[in-house]
Amino acid sequence: MLYYVLVFLVVALVAGALGFGGIAGASAGIAQILFFFFLALLVISLIASAIRKA
C-alpha cells in the first residue's frame, strides 16, 4: 500500500509541475485536474494505510 502512496505522490507532483509551471501550455487544465485527482488518491491511500495498521 505504501508503494501506491509513493506512486500517487510522484504522479501528483509531476502533474502539478506541468499544470502550474506553465510548461504544459494548452494542456495545463488537464494537468491541474490530474494533479487534484492523484492528490485525492494519495490522501485516500494514506488513510487506508493508517486504518490497516491500527
Swiss-Prot record:
Single GO cellular component term: plasma membrane
Segments passing through the bilayer: 5-25, 29-48
Keyword Cell membrane: yes
Coiled-coil boundaries: none
Classification via InterPro entries: DUF1328
UniProt entry keywords in alphabetical sequence: Cell membrane, Membrane, Transmembrane, Transmembrane helix
Subcellular location(s) of the protein: Cell membrane
Superkingdom field: Bacteria
Pfam families tied to this protein: DUF1328
Keyword Transmembrane: yes
Similarity-based family: Belongs to the UPF0391 family.
Protein name: UPF0391 membrane protein BMEI0373
Source taxonomy: Bacteria, Pseudomonadati, Pseudomonadota, Alphaproteobacteria, Hyphomicrobiales
